[in-house]
Each structure stands twice: as C-alpha cells, then as structure tokens.
C-alpha cells in the first residue's frame, strides 16, 4: 500500500514543523509500519511551465524544430526533436542551470548551429515510470493541462514534489489498505478527528428500477452486491490531480470512469468495477459460480479457462467479470460508452485468493478482497464514485441503488474488564482511559456492572476477542509508556535440549566464521523451485499448501531454505551491498501425503550463502572473492567441531554447478551439500554471480555427533615421510585416491595430504600429476625404511588397479 503525503492532508491536519520521516515514525510505532519513504521531485530544480507560442523548422536539421516559449516573465528559444509539440501547448521546461533526476544538469547550448536555452521535458525525464503513464505520454514531451499557469514551478504545479509512503501492512489490518483507514489511525495518534469526504449525489430523472436486474445465486461467495447506473456518460481523461494521485499510489490512469473506481478503492479500501451497460446481455448481472468448461476473455485480452469453484459476475448469456480479480473484455468501458453500471460488492476473500492464484492474476482489488473488507461501506463507495464523476461533468446519475444484501455483516461485541486488560498488558490504565481510547478508534462501549462490552466498528474485521481490545488500548496508549514490570508468576529454569544445544553450537561456529544469521518467512512458491532447477518430479515439489497465505507469492510451506536466502541476496544486491555472507537455521516441511490429512514432517536444516568478496581491497592488496573452498571449509569446520568423520564425494544436487558441487556422507547418508550455485539459477534470480551455498541436515547429523574429543597420544618416536608422485586420469577423484591410500597404508600411516598438482608438458594428455605426502609413525619404536616399504608398495598397486595411476 502506498499513500501520498499531499493526499493524506485532505483528511487530517499535519503539523508542518514535523518532518515526513517523523510522520512515518508516528504510524510505525503504533503498529502501522512504514517500509519506505520516497521523496518525489526532491532532485529536480529550475523546471518551469512554459507556453509554446511559435514553432519553426530548424534550418540545419530536418528532424529538429525551434520553439519559442512564453515563460511568464520572458521568452526562451529551445531546440527539440519531439514530434508531439504544437503551438499553444503548455509544457515543463528545464531552463539553464536546471537539475533533473539521475544527476542530469541542463545548460544553454547550441544544437546544429542554433541556440537552445533549455530543454522541453518528457514525463519520464521528470522521474515518472513509463508503466504509470498514458500511452500518449510515454514518448515525446509531457503536455500539461490547458489551464496550467505559465511561469510557475512545474514540479509543484504537477504534484511531483511530494512524499510517498510505502507501508508493510500485516494481513489482518485490511482497514489500513485505504487513505481513509490510514487517516483514521493518524488522527487518533495526533488527537484530532479525521475529516472524511462528504458524499452527496444529485440524482437525475431516469431511474435504475426496471433497467437493471441483479441476482445473487451464491450467497456463500457473495454476501452483498450493490449497483448504480450512470447515463449520458462522457468517457475521457480524468482530471490531472487525480491522475497524479493514482500514480503515487502505483496505479496507472486509464480513463475517467476507471480512474474514479480506482481512486475510490484507494480512498475507502473497497474495490469497484464498471460495466458498459449496453454490452450486458439482458441488462442483467448475476453473481454465480462459473459453469463447467466456461471461458472468459479478461481485460488483458487473454482467454482464461474457468472452473466451477470460481465466482463470476455474468449477464444473461455469459461471464462478464471474474469476481474480485479482473473484468471481462467484452463489457469494458470505452470511449464509445454512454451508459455505465457501477458495481460494489462483498466477495469471500478465500475464494478470490484461490481464483487469482489459479488464473495467475493479482490486482489491487483482489489484494483487498483477500484480506476482507467492510461490507457496510459498499453503497457509500458507490455514491462517492458517482459524486466524483458528476463533479467532473462526466455523467448524470440514475435515481436509486440496487442493493442485494443477502448476508449482512455481523456486528461483533467483545466483553472485557479493565482488570483483565491490565493483567494482560502489565499496565495500570484506568477504565475511563480505555473507553476514551476505544471511542477514538470508532468503538462504542457499553457497561454492565464491571463488565465492558466493546461494539467493534464494521471496518475492523481483525478485532474478535479480548486480546485484540488490549492491543488497541496498548498501541494508542503508547508502547513506550508501558513500564517494565516483573512477572508475577513463579518461574522455574528449564534445561536446554540436546538438539537446541547442537543448533546453538553450529550457529556459533558459522557466526565466528563471519556469517550473519537471518530469519525469513517459512513460505515459498513453485516458481522459486523452478528458478533453482529442481525437476518437476523432485520431492521438493511435494509441499504443504497454505489455506490462507499472507500473499499470493508464498502459497506453500517451504521444502528448502535456499529460495529464502536467494531473496535476501536479491534485496541486498538491489541496495548495492556487494558482500553477503548469511545462514539460517530453520524448519522445512514435507507432507506425509497429499492432500494433507495428518501432521507434516518438520525437519531442521542449516543453509548458508556466500556472495561477493571474502576480503575488501586495500592499498597493498586486491579484493578476494569467495570460492568453492570457503563453503567446503565451513562444512569441515562444523563437522570437525561435532566430532563427525565423513567422506567427501561429488554431488549431483540440482541447484549446484555440475563441476563445483560436493557432499559429505557417512555410508549412504548425506550430511551436507555445498558448492557453487548453478549459473542458470544465478541468471534466474538476475544476480551478478557467482554464488556459493550449503545445506546441512540436522536430523542426519544428530546420531553421529561425538562431542567428546578423540585422544591421540603424542608420539615419542620420529616419523618417516614418503612423497608419492603419481599420474592419474583427469577424471580421478581426490577423495577416492585418499581412501585408497588410507586403506592400504597399514597400521603406521599417521597422515596423508596432497601438496602438489602438475599438468605441464611432461604429463601425458588426459592425465594429471598428483603428489601426496605420507607420514608414518610407530608408538613402539623408530621405524625403518623396510617397515614402510610394503605399505607403500600396496598403495601403488591399489592406485594402479583402482584408479589407473602410474608412478612418476
């Protein structure tokens, strides 16, 4: 949800001495978190409105023209290549010394021999995203309304100088997905009353009765359906101020009718939809489930297959709208439309969510329906839309409203006492103060002896029980005003479980190695598994579906932590963090069967990610990037600290680079997998790789852990060393060679390590030279060459037989 600081001031008075950030802090502290504050137009200077009075061809360039502009107090001559300029137009002009987004500076110059005293600006050059512009505004100069004053600050005049807030609202606060809802909250926090718009509609002589029929066939999925009719409609552009407010909310203007429905949705949080009345067969609207095999072409001109579980709004012949998700192309409002039906309805949120997910569609409207909305506000929203269109002179309003309200919204009453709330919060707030706080939030309170009953306002669908009342009291009273108190109950010290101790131990090892622990959502999408190259028959796709996901992006319980960490990496790269070293210890979830009928399997995993530079550049040293051996070293450090001896082998794990992937195993049990992320995965996430990752499986580690360190007596006698240089095929695996040496090294072999790799001219094609250092020692006496000759011979013979090795 985005809101404009300028728009907010229609409803509340904001202290000008407070900064925009302080305004955001007030809401955040009270539980309405502001995720981001965008300062629109702050980097734009010296852009003035000017009127084109004369256009002549450039004498030295066929594709350029010379414009003379009235700037109010002077005239300017500007050369442009734009093809949409006309005499009499008012346009934004960047004069000499102007600053534009991206650090662009404008100065007086000559273009093909003619002086240009500035630049005519497009909307894009003033910072507006193309996706928020009308088609005709995406190329050429931005043409401003005819009534725009000349010679004034273009940024202020066009509403581009503003502060836009982006909120990270929790799904339960559906009431705050609107300007009015946010204004109510701020009004309470700043001890004032929100100034809500006064809605009055001047109805015309025509009546809606007899001209439109509305039927609700499925009251489970559609609780209320209200409609108004507008006639003598003139479809065109909406007012400039409305277009700008919609853009700041992230919505692209289309035409005055559609823009008004979107404007009212953002203002009141209740979606509306507009139909061309003359395109509705039988002049009838029916809220019903889709028929078997039914299809609809939606507004994006894509034909979509419907299922019998989906709610549609149909005319007498066919589906005209996917309810709450997207309208139908066949009933779209166009410039030829003269009669419009406005719809405002209350649909079941879970149904809209499932329909949107099945069709791959999500909109501002569906996001609000999914969270639930105030059914009582439907007619009020209809009237507001009719009022706005009427004020534009775009229509007349037919008398009457059709309102089918088959399942009225329940009025919630919550019983509580001041003592229970105070016990719950650890506070000492008076009963009178609680009643006063609730009253400012729209609750009415009745008292019966010591029991208070709060009547919940219809827009607060999240309040259902006493703790909700306590939360409302606490956040308005001020969390910062609640004093710390000691718990009144007896507390006994618990003991740390073994698994918890192991998790803490692993966390300590990874943190000491320079990684940061993260905590992410336990959800994922099928798309994230595809990005990581898991095949469709992979067990990772056997995921637990969520009945009420917090967003459509996360419909499943995760079966791997990798997507979560990749999302963290993407966000960090977006803000130019060039070093990411993170890990997470969390659960993954696998169903025993689908559909889920019993408790799912929950397994703890430790997943990490390394990206960027291990060390930063300094004057004598270059920066060094992470590599395969960093993740390998982390795995060895963890396993060694747990007293686990495992074998290394090549891994074929789908997300990993085929040539840079490994795993540690004990027998057939995989303890961990690690390596470089597959280049295709990196591309799928649009990350500038390489990325190194690891996964450890706690349930497989636990039975093997030996935290009692092995004791090795320090040898009293000297060791003998032998260096073996062998030629082996390049396909030979280092781990296999080590296993052969250890197996045939006999009782005196104390250690072995690879100390040289050579593949120069003296080595045959297809081979590589490996040099191993072998250490032999006896606890009983000094070894002679004869004592170790046989083990060395056995090693060479076994290497030759099993690995095709030759002694150099």
Where are these regions (language model features)?
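Phosphate-backbone binding interfaces of nucleic-acid-interacting proteins
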Residues: 1-206, 341, 360, 364, ...
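A carboxyl-terminal module marker
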Residues: 2, 29, 440-443, 462, ...
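Short, hydrophobic beta-strand segments
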Residues: 3-10, 161-170, 223-231, 364-371, ...
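Glycine/proline-enriched, intrinsically flexible loops and inter-domain linkers
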Residues: 4, 11-12, 23-25, 65, ...
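Conserved mixed alpha/beta core segments that line enzyme active sites in large multi-domain catalysts
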Residues: 49-79, 150-151, 244, 255, ...
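Mobile "lid/hinge" segments at catalytic clefts and subdomain interfaces of large enzymes
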Residues: 115-127, 138-142, 155, 163, ...
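Terminal amphipathic helices with adjacent charged low-complexity linkers/tails
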Residues: 190-216, 393-421, 428
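Extended, well-folded interaction surfaces typified by the phenylalanyl-tRNA synthetase beta subunit core
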Residues: 414-580, 722, 775-778, 787, ...
